[in-house]
């Protein structure tokens, strides 16, 4: 039986930290779904369609990654996708409490859904999409933190 995992997030935009996590997940699981949440309450900079397209381009080199958008509860989406593993990145202790709450709620909604936490590589442990956007808005150089296609799209958005 194939091990199908879902790596969910808003990915607004996808960063090299996200790419690091999904790349390592592909070595652990047969099929990884990069699930991009619509998240209208977060008022994303990029539309869902743009985020999906950017992530598809940024992960094209990973043969066992499928990118798709979703707007349902994660447990419902996982059930539909026949996946029982959630990948979550943990950057710092501050992430842990929130992620633990999500993991317990997801397990309540779908008892067979396991959350697997991956630490990003040290190089990416301090970045977030929000931080990268904030630095870019103030003309800071964020080239190192984003896939090339995403960096270009971000610069175009900020013009």
UniProtKB/Swiss-Prot annotation:
GO terms for cellular component: cytoplasm. Its cofactor is Mg(2+). The keyword DNA repair does not apply. Belongs to the bacterial CoaD family. Substrate binds at residues 10, 42, 74, 88. Keywords: ATP-binding, Coenzyme A biosynthesis, Cytoplasm, Magnesium, Nucleotide-binding, Nucleotidyltransferase, Transferase. The keyword Nucleotide-binding applies. ATP binds at residues 10-11, 18, 89-91, 99, 124-130. Pathway: Cofactor biosynthesis; coenzyme A biosynthesis; CoA from (R)-pantothenate: step 4/5. Reversibly transfers an adenylyl group from ATP to 4'-phosphopantetheine, yielding dephospho-CoA (dPCoA) and pyrophosphate. Homohexamer. It catalyses: (R)-4'-phosphopantetheine + ATP + H(+) = 3'-dephospho-CoA + diphosphate. SUPFAM superfamilies: Nucleotidylyl transferase. The record marks 18 as: Transition state stabilizer. Its main location: cytoplasm. GO terms for molecular function: ATP binding; pantetheine-phosphate adenylyltransferase activity. This is Phosphopantetheine adenylyltransferase. It is found in: Cytoplasm. GO terms for biological process: coenzyme A biosynthetic process. NCBIfam families: coaD_prev_kdtB, cyt_tran_rel. Its EC number is 2.7.7.3.
């Amino acid at each position: 039986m194939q091990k199908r995992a879902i790596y969910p997030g808003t990915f607004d935009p996808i960063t090299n930290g996200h790419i690091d996590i999904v790349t390592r997940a592909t070595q652990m699981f047969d099929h990884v779904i990069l699930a991009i949440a619509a998240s209208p309450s977060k008022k994303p900079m990029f539309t869902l369609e743009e985020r999906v397209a950017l992530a598809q381009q940024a992960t094209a080199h990973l043969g066992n990654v499928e990118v798709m958008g979703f707007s349902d509860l994660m447990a419902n989406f996982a059930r539909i996708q026949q996946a029982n593993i959630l990948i979550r990145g943990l950057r710092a202790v501050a992430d842990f409490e929130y992620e633990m709450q999500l993991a317990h709620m997801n397990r309540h909604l779908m008892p067979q859904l396991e959350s697997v936490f991956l630490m990003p590589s040290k190089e990416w442990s301090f970045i977030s999409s929000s931080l990268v956007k904030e630095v870019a808005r103030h003309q800071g150089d964020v080239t190192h933190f984003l896939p090339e296609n995403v960096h270009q799209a971000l610069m175009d958005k900020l013009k």
